[in-house]
Amino acid sequence: GKRGAEIVGWAADIYKKLNVSAEKLEEAKEQLKAEAEEFYKDYDAATDQKILVEMLRLYNQNLTPDWIPEEVQLANRKKGIEAYVQTLFSKSILADQENTMKLIAQATPDTYKKLEKDPAYRLSLSMNTFYAQNIFPELAKIEKEITRLNQIWLAGLMEMQPDKTFYADANSTL
């Protein structure tokens, strides 16, 4: 996905689920406990760290700065990608199952604010914000144009083959 490393997506998921009203917090905590057990069952932080280093390195090598999230650009300029990722994994609560389970168990209505300072969440927020502001609008325009052109193509096909019966296909292109 756009985030690459599992910890980045996990940070966004936990934040979203803990950012609920006090009335819904206990239900969210129970759901998160089960999800955390599943997540950490076969999670390997060392592997995830290597993946994140390579992914961010590739961003910086292959994209122009206007296509790189701000957090990634700052990381590259300040410490370098490898040092940034090492710090992220050493300081993130979410890199360790025991710390995450403790965070969930002790969660209060304000716990999500603590996650806002977590380096994995900050990276996730930067990437998601960048995607929402820069990539999604362009992607939506392209998809709209593809839909419009598919309709023109189908109308032309039906006009060329008036005796043929056309059926909708599974992915809704017809």
Language model segments and positions:
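Terminal presequence/propeptide segments associated with secretion/organelle targeting
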Residues: 1-174
